[in-house]
Amino acid sequence: MSAVMATYLLHDETDIRKKAEGIALGLTIGTWTDLPALEQEQLRKHKGEVVAIEELGESERVNAYFGKRLKRAIVKIAYPTVNFSADLPALLVTTFGKLSLDGEVRLLDLEFPDEWKRQFPGPRFGIDGIRDRVGVHNRPLLMSIFKGMIGRDLAYLTSELKKQALGGVDLVKDDEILFDSELLPFEKRITEGKAALQEVYEQTGKRTLYAVNLTGKTFALKDKAKRAAELGADVLLFNVFAYGLDVLQALREDEEIAVPIMAHPAFSGAVTPSEFYGVAPSLWLGKLLRLAGADFVLFPSPYGSVALEREQALGIARALTDDQEPFARAFPVPSAGIHPGLVPLIIRDFGLDTIVNAGGGIHGHPDGAIGGGRAFRAAIDAVLAGRPLRAAAAENEALQKAIDRWGVVEVEA
C-alpha cells in the first residue's frame, strides 16, 4: 500500500491507542467495526493504520500547561495515498485538518512514498543554481534586509541599494512588510533596482541580487510574477504563509516565472511555536517549503529575540538540504538578531551552504550599510581562514567597530 506516514505527538487523559485509532479512522473511512465484512473488504485499501506507538513518560511540565494529567506518546499513522490527490491542501487536510483543532496533538513529520513526492517540483534553482547566479561557491552567502523603506521613494531605494551592494553583500531583500505603493511601485523597484546594482557591478565587478517582495491579491500574483520575470527580476520574496503552500507551488511550476523564490516565515508563528500542538518547524518551514519549490527559506535563528531552539533551527536546515531527497537543496537562511560577531557560530551550526542574513547588523553599523557589509565579509573570511574574529578585527576597522558595538562569540575549534 502506498501511504503517507504521519508522525504525531499525542496527549490523552486515558487511552493513547484508542485516540490514535480514532484519528486513523476519522481521517480516512470514518468507521470500521460496524461495517459488514464485504464493505470492510472494499474499504480496506482506504483505511488509515496506526503503525507504531512509542509511549513517553508523564511530564509535570505538560500537565501544568494543560491543567490536567495526560499520557503522552509518539504515534505513526499511515494514510493511503489513494484517498487524496497529490496536492498540498489535500495532504494537509488529510493529515492535520480537523485534527489541528484538537489542541493536544502536534504534527511532527510527514514521510512520503518516492513516487508520490516526485509529483512535486522542489526548488527550480536551489543552492547550486543560486551560487551560479551570484558567482560565489566557496563560502556562505551574505544578504542584507532592506529596512526603513516605508514612506521612502525610489531615489532613496536606489541610493540605499547601492550602499548595501558596495558593502559586499551577495543579496539584498525587501522587507516583508514592503508592499506595492505609489512611492515604491513593484515594477519600478525591479527596473530601478537592477540599474543601480548594475552600476555597482560595473564599478566593482561584484554581482548583487535583489529580492523584490511579490505581493497583492492571490489571483493576480501569477501575472505579476510573470511581469517581474519579463523585467529581469533577480529573486522574488514571497510571504508564503499569508497565501498558502499551494500558491508557492503554482508560482514555482509556471515556466514563465523562471525566477528564484525566497520564502519568508511571516505568519508561521501561528502554527509552529508550541511544543505541545501545531506543526513542527522542520516540517512546516523545511520539508514542505522545499517540496513546494522554495529556493531559499528564511526562519528564526537560534540567536535573536525571536529565536528558535538550536535543534529546531538545525532541523529546518537539514530538511532543506537533505541529499537523500529527489529535489535540489534549498538555501537555509537563519534570520533575526544576526551581527558580525555571530558569524563563527552561524558557520559552526549551519556550515558553508547557508546565508548570513542581517538587517540591523548591517544598517546599524557605525559606518552605515557599507561598513556593515564589509564587517560581515571580513568576519566570514576570518572564520574560513581559521582566525579568531578579534585578531582579524585588529586589521579591519569595519569589523572592529562591529565587535565594539555588538560583541563577538568565538567558537573553539
Swiss-Prot record:
Domain of life: Bacteria
Binding sites annotated in the UniProt record for Mg(2+): K173, D175, E176
GO biological process, one term: L-methionine salvage from methylthioadenosine
Cofactor: binding details: Binds 1 Mg(2+) ion per subunit.
Chain residues that bind substrate: K147, K173, D174, D175, E176, H264, G337, G359, G360
InterPro entries: Diketo-Methiopentyl-P_enolase, RuBisCO, RuBisCO_lsu_C, RuBisCO_lsu_C_sf, RuBisCO_lsu_fd_N, RuBisCO_lsu_N_sf
List of residues that carry N6-carboxylysine: K173
Disulfide bond positions: none
Catalytic-site annotation from UniProt: K98 (proton acceptor)
Sample GO molecular function, one term: 2,3-diketo-5-methylthiopentyl-1-phosphate enolase activity
Pfam families assigned to the protein according to its UniProt record, in alphabetical order: RuBisCO_large, RuBisCO_large_N
Cofactor names: Mg(2+)
E.C. number(s) listed in UniProt: 5.3.2.5
Keyword set, alphabetical order: Amino-acid biosynthesis, Isomerase, Magnesium, Metal-binding, Methionine biosynthesis
HAMAP family: Salvage_MtnW
Protein name stated in the entry: 2,3-diketo-5-methylthiopentyl-1-phosphate enolase
Native organism taxonomy: Bacteria, Bacillati, Bacillota, Bacilli, Bacillales
